[in-house]
Amino acid sequence: MALELFNTLSGKIETFQPLEDNEVRMYACGPTVYDYGHIGNFRTFIVVDTLRRFLKQSGYKLKHVMNVTDVDDKIIRNAARDGKTVQEYTAKYRKAFLEDCEALNIEHPELLVNATDHIDEMARFIKRMEDLDVAYKTEDGSYYFRIAKFPEYGKLSKKDFAGMNDGARVDVDEYEKDNARDFALWKAPKPGEAKWDTVIGSGRPGWHIECSIMSMKYLGESFDIHLGGEDLVFPHHENEIAQSESVTHKKFANFWVHSRFLLVEGQKMSKSLGNFFTVRDLILMGHKPSSIRFLLMSVPYRKQLNFTFDGLKQAAISVDRLRNFKRRIQTEPFAEGTNDKIGLMANETITKIKAALDNDLNTAEALAPIFDLVRDVNAAADAGEVKRGDVASLLEALQKFDEIFAVLNDDDSGKVKFAVDWANQEGKADKISAETAEMAKAAGLSDEKVEALVAEHSAARKAKDFKRSDAIRAELMESGIILENTKDGVRWKRK
């Protein structure tokens, strides 16, 4: 089965076929680094990561570009408020974005590019637009796009803009469909604002031109997939299409993939409601990065996700169940031999996961077969039906699953330490929960090191050196490692 994706441009599910045989070129709108990213932002970034991982697993060579918007209205306003240059202000939040991605196991794109490194290209492209009469200069030195010159304007957002506000202008970056006007490509400088000197004069780019230029520079005038959150369909992505296609006369992106918003406890996320959470907020509250990632992946990207704290607890239980299963099949002394039934179950699991992801990245559907496998193999192991020769096929099924979901081989303790260090540096030590502090203590305590300590604990008990075995158990407990005695020996798990 081939990958099928819902294409916002056509309004239907289509079979994905790259423009070039085995290479996928895709562009994702990245962060606007004016503040710490919230969990709604990271739902979108995890959707991008899921598609990226699945394309690679499916054998495609990938060229994935993500931008960093490091100049826009909000950034300029906030930098001025804090008495900093744009560069000084955004450096902090760009670093924070990368730290949050690392915590959530979001892979880096092949290229992560800053808007401010491409301002000359933006200015030259605007000059081309002016020469083609699809852009015009105003008295103050700003440039605007003539939406009346692009008859297909509205084809992405499915709204007919014909004759609407003809010739009127809007100079803010974000606005509603009913306020559609000629939009700003280049903004003349205001006193005290950041500005750049270019072939079209002094000023700064509008938000929409940034992504057109960076995507076409690295991926070409036509590329395979453009991704973002549903809030970007209009005006941002609509304007990207208009700018790009009015000059190149080529289809800008073949597929447009948009993820839905999320709710928090059934309500729209809002600082005024007290339900606005960043990734590091959740980590400091004691929630594992793997649980956050799992919950954000548990609902298909085109469905609204209701992010709840009960859901986070259930996600933690689910991840622990998977990790405990993996640990069991790696460490349990199964009898020699092979049970063909177990190998068949493992192979069927791999097939079902792929089929679910081919079905418009249906992550919820992909989770079901892995938990069916865990249930059935645990029951078989309890009955003595799993053999040593079955372990490789079971581990392969887990590996294929985790190439996409990325929650099994994660050291949550190591992922948590950055948030604790950040809280201490920012004077927010009071926000560090006891659970988070405990996890941070285990930073660097790898599975291999835990295994070595567990083996030493078992050897000490066998030698009746109970003082040493108790000391090891206490050391592990302090680092969030729980030991369990079973008929097959000692097992361990992280809290």
From Swiss-Prot:
Gene for this chain: cysS
GO biological process: cysteinyl-tRNA aminoacylation
Keyword Amino-acid biosynthesis: no
Subcellular location: Cytoplasm
Catalytic activity reported: tRNA(Cys) + L-cysteine + ATP = L-cysteinyl-tRNA(Cys) + AMP + diphosphate
Organism: Koribacter versatilis (strain Ellin345)
Renumbered ranges of motif 'HIGH' region: 31-41
Residues holding Zn(2+): 29, 211, 236, 240
Annotated protein name in UniProt: Cysteine--tRNA ligase
Cofactor entry: Zn(2+)
GO cellular component, one term: cytosol
HAMAP family, sorted: Cys_tRNA_synth
SUPFAM superfamilies: Anticodon-binding domain of a subclass of class I aminoacyl-tRNA synthetases, Nucleotidylyl transferase
Entry keyword set: Aminoacyl-tRNA synthetase, ATP-binding, Cytoplasm, Ligase, Metal-binding, Nucleotide-binding, Protein biosynthesis, Zinc
Cofactor note: Binds 1 zinc ion per subunit.
Subunit structure: Monomer.
Motif 'KMSKS' region, residue range(s) on this chain: 268-272
